[in-house]
Amino acid sequence: MGIDRRRNVIIIGAGNPGMALADYRGFNDSGFRIAALIDVDPAKIGRSSRSGIPVLSFSDLKRIVREQHVEIGIIAVTADAAQNVYDALVEAGLNAILNFAPVQLRTHSQVKLKSVDLRINLESLSFYLQGVEDGAS
């Protein structure tokens, strides 16, 4: 199933969503190691998440992916920055990417992309609740 060994993960975006993902303990319990947080904001670079994961510069992405043996990238940036981040992750050699940005990305055929759209998921739950409220199940 692909979860029989540890995999190194990198998170792009050290804002609130990225920091929350970096500090989520369930990743480590499931065999995923967050190797680094990456950001373009000089005010964030050099800081760490609450769990001690360093925020490194986006300009060092390729080197970090190579040195940390990163296999999976997580996009936790704004919608307007997401495509550039996706392209940079692919250029750095990643073939598996999880996208939290609320935008549909132009993808490469050799790359597996999974997107998490919180708005769509909330709309789905709201639709379900409306059915319950209307007497359907």
Language model region names:
Residues 7-102:
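A solvent-exposed beta-alpha-beta segment
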